[in-house]
Amino acid sequence: LVASQVSNAVMGFISNFQVALNPQITKDYATGNITGMERLSYLGIKYSFLILFMMAFPLCLNIDYVLHLWLVDVPDYAALFIILIMIDALCGTLFGTPFMTSLSATGWIRNYQIVVSCIILCIFPIGYIALKFGCSASSVFYISIFFTLIAGFVRFLFCRSLIGYSLKKLIKDVLSPVAGVTVLSLPLPVFIKYHFLEAQTLGNFISLCII
């Protein structure tokens, strides 16, 4: 429940940002401006990821402090579940609302909805099987992350097939920049956290957020 509350709060902010792009994406398709539509979709995805990353990374890095500040009794595995949910949300953002809006603008959404829905629904039976075979509860979140990425990439393939989106542009304009920012942002705060600011204090939390 705690993990879901954190996820809903963060994703609500991102959804409001992405919704603002929807009218222009639809308008670009209606006027035949596919290049502008694709560019706006990639910009929306990139900035959504970066905004979410800036919110999620400090939270995950200081998750124990935040949970103890928020709750009296922290549920078992709450910290791990929140971190995994944030990772799942970041993966979903990479292939999220702008692609959905793009496909909706075409009107050809039946096959797309069927395929992507089936992929997402696979999380439930496979997660159940994993738990029945004695896997930890966190395994369900790992399974969710995997299928979120698969569903997202399939969503892009439909955009490529129906609209003409370019994989090369996706890599150049979205995946490469966000990968670069993510990789470069991780080492220093993590090093400082575990070598200089291990104590769970408000001052250390604020310092890490600034870094």
Residue ranges and their predicted role:
Residues 1-9, 27-28, 64-74, 193-197:
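Helix-terminus/linker motif at the lipid-water interface of multi-pass membrane proteins
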Residues 1-8, 39, 73-82, 204-207:
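Interfacial/gating helices of multi-pass transporter permease domains
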Residues 3, 7-45, 98-105:
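Helix-loop junctions and terminal segments of transmembrane helices
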Residues 5-8, 43, 56, 65, ...:
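Residue-level recognition of pore/gate-forming positions within transmembrane alpha-helices
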Residues 86-119, 163, 167:
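Membrane-interface junctions at transmembrane-helix termini in multi-pass inner-membrane proteins
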Residues 110, 117-153, 160-161, 165-167, ...:
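Membrane-interface helix-loop junctions in multi-pass transport and translocation proteins
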